[in-house]
Amino acid sequence: MGFHAYSSPYDWSRIAGFKATAKTVPGGMIDLSVGSPVDPVPSSVQQALVAGADAPNAHGYPVTAGTADLKAAIDTWFRELRGVDLKSINAAAVPTVGSKEAVALMASLLHLGEGDVVVQPAVSYPTYEIGTQLAGATVVKVDDVTDVDSWVNIPNVKAIWINSPCNPSGEVISADWLTDIVAAARRIGAVVLSDECYALMDWRSVRRNTAASSAPAASAAESNEPASDTAFSLSATPCALNPHVCEGSAAGILVLYSLSKQSNMAGYRTALIAGDYRLVKEMAEYRK
């Protein structure tokens, strides 16, 4: 079927002229546009990259679904940092070449097209909208995706984008709100697309990490966080795959995560999609 033309101008292109003008001002400009990391990549990552370059098959084609070590690392990351046991909720994960391409292709990977509707926040990452238009589907913007009444009765809604912590507002969607969104999406047969690339940048997570290191055996029930928000997670931002949110099943939920923000690795193009086993396995097949 191919890509459809998209009508929304890319935001970074729209502000290019303003950036050029700002750069001529004495002192330069403070660039808050793309959000490219300004701090260096952690030395541990650099060392691992060097070691990986010397691996016996570093020059060969990679495994599409990820190596056994990568799969194990993803499982551990979700379990220890997001409070999610992927296997227990029948979820799978697949690595992607950065998250931007995954976002842009998501509507197409879900076989959406003319007549289908994708809901997204009115103010959000521009690639949500462009990706929907590339698939030929219709974009519907709502002021607040947590207000399920604003979209649940719209005909032909097939997917809902959420972003928590949200860019640019910083708002964190609570576990209760996530539960409502997931339940409403399931009632209408839509997929929840949860962009969680800022999940570990919630400042409240610092307190959680400190508490966990001083009392590693502490249970969720002993913490000051609501029980519905954790299972236990070192991130204070609830995950859409949290068993309390998804009622023990990843069906109809896809979480996108990237190391670009968390580890200053935007140039490394390292990300993943995790969630609904059937959907993720299908996407892994496409990548082959």
Question: Residues of each region from the PLM?
Answer:
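Short catalytic/ligand-binding loop motif for oxyanion handling, primarily in non-cytosolic enzymes
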Residues: 38-43, 168-171, 200-202, 264-266
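Conserved core of the PLP fold type I
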Residues: 58-184, 199-213, 219, 229-248, ...
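Residue-level marker for buried hydrophobic side chains located in beta-strands
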Residues: 192-193
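Walker B catalytic acidic pair
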Residues: 196
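Conserved core segment of the aminotransferase class I/II
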Residues: 213-222, 226-228, 242-288
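N-terminal small-domain helix-loop-helix segment of the aminotransferase-like
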Residues: 2-98
